[in-house]
Structures are given as structure tokens and as C-alpha cells.
Amino acid sequence: MSKPELKEDKMLEVHFVGDDDVLNHILDREGGAKLKKERAQLLVNPKKIIKKPEYDLEEDDQEVLKDQNYVEIMGRDVQESLKNGSATGGGNKVYSFQNRKHSEKMAKLASELAKTPQKSVSFSLKNDPEITINVPQSSKGHSASDKVQPKNNDKSEFLSTAPRSLRKRLIVPRSHSDSESEYSASNSEDDEGVAQEHEEDTNAVIFSQKIQAQNRVVSAPVGKETPSKRMKRDKTSDLVEEYFEAHSSSKVLTSDRTLQKLKRAKLDQQTLRNLLSKVSPSFSAELKQLNQQYEKLFHKWMLQLHLGFNIVLYGLGSKRDLLERFRTTMLQDSIHVVINGFFPGISVKSVLNSITEEVLDHMGTFRSILDQLDWIVNKFKEDSSLELFLLIHNLDSQMLRGEKSQQIIGQLSSLHNIYLIASIDHLNAPLMWDHAKQSLFNWLWYETTTYSPYTEETSYENSLLVKQSGSLPLSSLTHVLRSLTPNARGIFRLLIKYQLDNQDNPSYIGLSFQDFYQQCREAFLVNSDLTLRAQLTEFRDHKLIRTKKGTDGVEYLLIPVDNGTLTDFLEKEEEEA
């Protein structure tokens, strides 16, 4: 190897040292004493770097700078600096004995490197006369030697040698090495460098695997969150918040401004009807034309009734006026009975009484409803010339939709000289009839949508605008008691019977609680006074009973309904029983 000429006495000399010379420097064979352990040599002097703007460097130079920064940080713990100008040291300073670096220490340094920002250092590789890097073309394309010329009397820290995996990347462009190369390694140096590089590559692979394992322990990678996942997470969180807001336990405040608190007096039924009659209906011409089309069917209906069919009318709107026109037009000379099914006091017994008393002129009594029905059927079968037209408004009303009521009406309509024409308004009205009842009625269905208001049909219902009469609570009694248990209905029935038995007593103020409890206990309806009080509380909530205390402090029970309504209710209960 040619020795470069030294211009000054204190310049650093670079010699090639073989393997034998290295062993002689590590261990003195003659004296048998170990030499002082030194750190690795300095590859680059960071204090002699001439900075250059980053935009002058190319992309390959940027990668070299990143690796040089890593080399600078990894050499922080160098303890001694190289003595400049010492030519007598020879390979002692260049090939010093290195301490074995443990993988744990390198892992700690790597973790510190990941946590702390790196030091930005710029390198000038083109015009720096003190740093010369030669890149010979070897079999693996790695750099063989570096020439470093530090300044005199400068104390600089030495950087530890970087791993081979990083040193392989410290390659400058080919144009730099071609123009600034001073010497090339011989073939023998290439052969020896190949073996050394193979060993260093193996150590570098093991070192990089340990560093990756430590990094996985120190900091776990955070998965990237795509916009779709972020939107789904936000949507889920919003749904959760909406669920808890909807099911929160906070009290919901509602307004207490109801119609009951209006200071205006309630109207009677006639006044309300007069006010509604002054309102002109919309599309009056179209409604009149629609009713005229239905009136053209009257003769057809009469023919079908005489052929053994019965007619049922359905559709939106009240059909009471339509049936009334049919009665006045076609049934003037015929015997007919009109039944208002929407009336709260109507019952099957009242229908049968109307037939026996008004049509058949029978003033006697019957033991039961079935006996009365058999007598009517026999009378119409005996006299075939006797004809009767039954017009029933709202056959599906609350008072007539019972199974027993429908069975009795169906048997009457099955007679060949009794003609039935009825109307229904409930959507589920056909569910009242099974196959047996359908065969008795033998219906012909006609859609007669009139769009007329249900004025008469709803006049008997409870309203906040109209004063109620004494007969109105009967529908309320029926609705409430049908939703109760059989024992509850039996308790209320006992109270009704006792009140009707004492209706002629002017001093009657009600039934005492103790006497009523004794009667319910004898009828096996309750087993304790707590059960009876719980049932009376339900009656009181529906305003079916009223309690008051007498002068003796005893609690008395009273039903605030007129006796006629209570009598009709008991008769209806007996019919359904």
C-alpha cells in the first residue's frame, strides 16, 4: 500500500495492518501484559463537518445523512479522544481492543432514540478536503476503507462503529467516488474483506432482530383507523347516547291544561247538534251524487231479501241515513222493526220483547230468553203469510257483539219470512261470525261509503263537551267490567243487587263495608278484607262506586248510577250468562 505524503509533522498517518500485527497490538507476547482497552476508532469527525443547505442534496444524500445521524448518536459514550499527530502509535490507536456491547444496552439506546428527537447534522461530501470516502467495487458492492484527516490539537468524541446493516447504506453516488478517490484496495484485501463482511452481516441480522423484539415490547404499533371505521364508531356512540337519553329516569313534564279545566259550561246534546248542523259539509254535491247511486239499489235489495238473502252494509261513514231512506221508501206498507245497536241500553231481550209485544201482540212472560226465541220461531213457521223486516244499525256494537246475541239474531234471520238488513262499522266485525253463524245469516255484502259523520252513533258516548244523562254510564260499566276477573264482576253484581233491593228505602245511604265483606266471603269471592279493599280501589278509580262515612263512623258503599241503568245491566249480564 502506498503511503501518502505528509505535509506536516503532526498529521495522522494511516497504515495497513495485517492480522498478525493486530494480535501483537492486542496482546504483547514478549511482556505478557494486556494493553489498555480502547474504544473503536472515529469514522467521522462531527466537529469538522461543513454544513450545506438541505435543498442542495439529492435524495440519496438525504438517506446518507439520516444514517450518519444514527452513527453520531450511537457514539455518545466514547470516553477518550484520539491524540492527534502521534505517528508512533501505529495500529494501536486504529485497531484498539473493543469492549463487548450487550444487546440489552443497544436496545435501551434504540428506545431512547425512538423517544428523543435526533440531532440534525448536515454533511458536505463534494468539497470537503478533510473527509475522503472511497467506495471500491467489491463483490458485494460495500465500501472497503475510509480516510479521515482531523485537525491538529482538537479534542473530539469518537463515534462507535455502526452496524453493518447501516454501514452498507453509507454509499455516496458513483460520481463522487470516481472523482475523489485516492486509492483502491488490492485483490487480497477484497478476499479478506469478503469473509469479514459475511461475519459482520450475520451479527447485524441478529442485532436487528433483537432490536425489533425490544421495540415490540417497548411500544406496540397503533393500528390505522380508516374513515369508515371512524364514522361507524361515531355513529355507534351517537346511538348509545340517544338510547340512554330516551330511557332516562328524568320526569317527563306534560301540560295539565285539559278540557276539564275550561271554565265554560258544558253544552247539552241538542245545543251541540244545532251548532254542528250550521256547518256546511265539504263536497256536498259529490256526496249527494254518491247517495243517489246507493238509492238506485233499493229495489235490488228488496228482491234479494225475498230470495232468502240478508244484506249487510259496510264502508266509511254513517249509514243510518241511508237505511232510514230505505225504510221510508220501500217499507211503508210492511211490518218492520228498527233497532239502534249503538244505544247503550239495547239488549237482545229488548229486541225479542219488541217482536213479541209489538208484532205478535203477546203480553205474557217467558221463563228464559231461549223459551221466548222458540215461541217466536214457532209463530213465524205456523203463519207463512207473516213477514217482518229487521233494520239493525251497528250490528257490531258493544251491546250486540256478544256470541249469544249474535246466535239469537242469526236464528231469527234464518227464517224465510224474516228479512234482515244491517250495517257494521268496526274493522274486525266479520270476526264475530264463524261458519255456523255465516250460514245462518247468509250475507250479501255491499260497500256503501257515505263519508257522513257519526253524529247519532257517538251521541251516547262520554264527551267532555256534552252533559251526560243517567243512562250513559251503562256503556262505561260494560267496558270496565268486561276487562275484570270473574270474581271482580261477582263482587260488583252483589253490590248492584243489594242497592236495587233497597231502592224503595228513602233512608238508604249505602252498604257498610263490614256487611259487604261478609256477603262476599259467604259467596267465596274474597278471603280477606285486603283483597276486597284492593278491588274496591279499582272500582273507585273508574268512578263506578263512591264511599262515604256515616254519623257512626262506618264506611258505606254506593253506586252513583240510576236504578234503571243498573237493572238493564243485570238483565244483560243474565243474557250473556
Swiss-Prot record:
Could you tell me where this protein is found in the cell?
Answer: Nucleus
Could you tell me the Gene Ontology terms of the biological process aspect for this record? DNA replication initiation; negative regulation of transcription by RNA polymerase II
Report the family membership.
Belongs to the ORC2 family.
Q: Which domain of life is it from?
A: Eukaryota
Q: Which residues form the signal peptide?
A: none
Protein's gene: ORC2
Involved in LRWD1-binding repeat segments: 1-100
Q: Which InterPro entries match?
A: ORC2, RecA-like_ORC2, WHD_ORC2
Q: How does it assemble?
A: Component of ORC, a complex composed of at least 6 subunits: ORC1, ORC2, ORC3, ORC4, ORC5 and ORC6. ORC is regulated in a cell-cycle dependent manner. It is sequentially assembled at the exit from anaphase of mitosis and disassembled as cells enter S phase. Interacts with DBF4. Interacts with MCM10. Interacts with LRWD1 throughout the cell cycle; this interaction, which occurs only with non-ubiquitinated form of LRWD1, prevents LRWD1 ubiquitination and hence stabilizes the protein. Interacts with POLQ.
Q: What does this protein do?
A: Component of the origin recognition complex (ORC) that binds origins of replication. DNA-binding is ATP-dependent. The specific DNA sequences that define origins of replication have not been identified yet. ORC is required to assemble the pre-replication complex necessary to initiate DNA replication. Binds histone H3 and H4 trimethylation marks H3K9me3, H3K20me3 and H4K27me3. Stabilizes LRWD1, by protecting it from ubiquitin-mediated proteasomal degradation. Also stabilizes ORC3.
Q: Which GO terms describe its molecular function?
A: DNA replication origin binding
- The protein here is known as Origin recognition complex subunit 2
Segments for region (Disordered): 81-199
Provide ranges: composition bias, Acidic residues. 188-199
| Basic and acidic residues bias spans | 143-157
Modification type Phosphothreonine: residues: 116, 226
Where Phosphoserine occurs, the residues are: 122, 138, 248, 280
* UniProt GO cellular component terms: centrosome; chromosome, telomeric region; heterochromatin; inner kinetochore; membrane; nuclear origin of replication recognition complex; nucleoplasm; nucleus
Alphabetized UniProt keyword annotations: DNA replication, Nucleus, Phosphoprotein
